[in-house]
């Protein structure tokens, strides 16, 4: 019986395979992506659709959990094997099972390998092919970009979260479970950010459109700035006169001795001059034509 480099798992007793030399040259892309059923047939003990967490921890702890031969559902449970790829995980990495079988069955183990080192040294020969396949669009990288970094997976060999699980060595099943919790938290946080309600636009912060007339402040009004402090607005000249362009001028009785009360030498009647049609400026210029903003001229009451 050949002792596996993983202390809790024996290759021959579980797979029926005899350790052999690592193939050289590297298998071609077509060979790696060949019929997955052949892989399942070569590893009878792994060719089961579902395994509960207890079985995985008991029988395949260091083998499956460290090599990532098990996928997770959206709830994070150890439910399905990665051979073939887990449905819904967005993984097209079923070929990796062939690589791992070749790695595991290679002999002898590297000197000093104690089962707690990363598998980066074993995956490195495949890195050029992995990068080449990424360039060909064979893999999706979004899962790794979002979640793979949370478990410290090496980016040059990891192309999605399944790869992060495949190529990251954990010291214990507890460490593996902790990494899954980190992943679930990352998924939850990303989902919360995507589904968070957008803050409503602040109407006070909106800038006026070019050409739009800003509302005038009337005498005695107080505008609040962003700090919430009231600001006394100085009334304009028109407001000082008692009216502005937004309010019709009030009817004021004429006072004797004022310029607005003049006696006509011909009729002897008192006539009331209407106020300027467009504020003080128009009155100074002597313009009495009505404008869109002017109030209707008042005629003397008989």
Curated annotation (Swiss-Prot):
Residue spans of biased composition, Polar residues class: 288-302
Region Disordered, residue ranges: 217-302
Comp. bias regions, Low complexity: 254-271
Record keywords: Capsid protein, Helical capsid protein, Virion
Subcellular location: Virion
Main location: virion
Entry's Gene Ontology cellular component terms: helical viral capsid
Protein function: Capsid protein self-assembles to form a flexuous, filamentous capsid (Potential). The capsid encapsulates the single-stranded RNA genome.
Protein name (Swiss-Prot/TrEMBL): Capsid protein
Organism: Botrytis virus F (isolate Botrytis cinerea/New Zealand/Howitt/2001)
């Amino acid at each position: 019986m050949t002792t596996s480099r993983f202390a809790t798992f024996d290759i021959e007793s579980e797979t029926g395979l005899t350790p052999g030399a690592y193939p050289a040259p590297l298998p071609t892309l077509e060979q790696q992506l060949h019929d997955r059923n052949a892989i399942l047939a070569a590893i009878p003990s792994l060719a089961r659709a579902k395994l509960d967490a207890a079985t995985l921890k008991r029988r395949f702890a260091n083998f499956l959990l460290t090599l990532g031969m098990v996928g997770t559902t959206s709830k994070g449970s150890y439910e399905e094997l990665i051979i073939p790829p887990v449905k819904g995980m967005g993984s097209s990495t079923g070929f990796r099972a062939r690589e791992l079988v070749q790695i595991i069955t290679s002999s002898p183990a590297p000197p000093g390998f104690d089962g707690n080192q990363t598998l980066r040294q074993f995956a490195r020969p495949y890195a050029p092919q992995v990068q080449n396949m990424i360039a060909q669009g064979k893999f999706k990288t979004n899962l790794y970009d979002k979640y793979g970094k949370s478990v410290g997976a090496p980016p040059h060999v990891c192309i999605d979260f399944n790869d992060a699980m495949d190529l990251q060595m954990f010291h214990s099943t507890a460490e593996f479970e902790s990494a899954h919790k980190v992943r679930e938290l990352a998924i939850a946080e990303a989902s919360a950010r995507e589904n968070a309600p957008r803050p409503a636009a602040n109407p006070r912060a909106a800038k006026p459109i070019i050409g739009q007339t800003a509302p005038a402040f009337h005498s005695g009004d107080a505008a609040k700035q962003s700090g919430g402090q009231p600001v006394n607005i100085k009334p304009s000249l028109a407001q000082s006169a008692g009216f502005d362009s937004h309010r019709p001028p009030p009817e004021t009785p004429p006072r004797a001795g004022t310029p607005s009360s003049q006696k006509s030498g011909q009729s002897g009647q008192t006539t009331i001059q209407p106020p300027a049609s467009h504020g003080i400026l128009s009155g100074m210029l002597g313009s009495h034509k009505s404008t869109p903003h002017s109030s209707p001229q008042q005629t003397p009451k008989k």
